[in-house]
């Protein structure tokens, strides 16, 4: 255990200790600037439970945690399966990926090369109701009457943000799942096809079971991204208005609300209280996914 002492000490210092400090400060009235503060017990937690904006941000964060992994992982599995197994049969091979699959993987992965801030800015320009690319295309096909204010409409803003997050992350999972599928022996697919199975059947009976551990890890990772920095960056750049968090707080999420309370309003103690709630939500999400996704490990 001696060689683990230094890494464990660093982990405790830079990961565990900040969490402990945050929990401690959540019981105080610290502003974040003054060295003096007093203990107020569960005052911040009582305030949080009565805070309508907190509940709205929690609702949006939970929506992100459920919808984004479902859509992103689902699309990534479909694209990866098509790239590796979905092509037409060729001479000497019972199964094959689509032609040019290596090129498509590069195309799908390209958004990962861009900073999430750049991606958010690009889509902010595209969503512009007056000069954006999306409304310009709608005008070009004769839909002049359909010109939504994408980020200014409370009913559309959250969906627009989620589209950006899916677009920016799906390529990473396509490459991840493609690597996993490439390690599955082709004999399994050939035997299944000889027995009369189609590609739909082989996906659910061969690919998905053998790739399950990777899918589960990807689901948890995407959920953590949706609850953390990725959602904060996109919402902060694309939709923050005078009140913060889009029109009528329609896109406010927990990480952004923590930031606003800590750095805009000078309420660091209350911000750490919301941060504790975010920590509990993240841990609960990971625990639920691991519990629901638990199954016997398949070897090949």
Q: What feature does the model see in each segment?
A:
Residues 3-300:
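A structural signal for multi-pass alpha-helical bundles of membrane permease subunits
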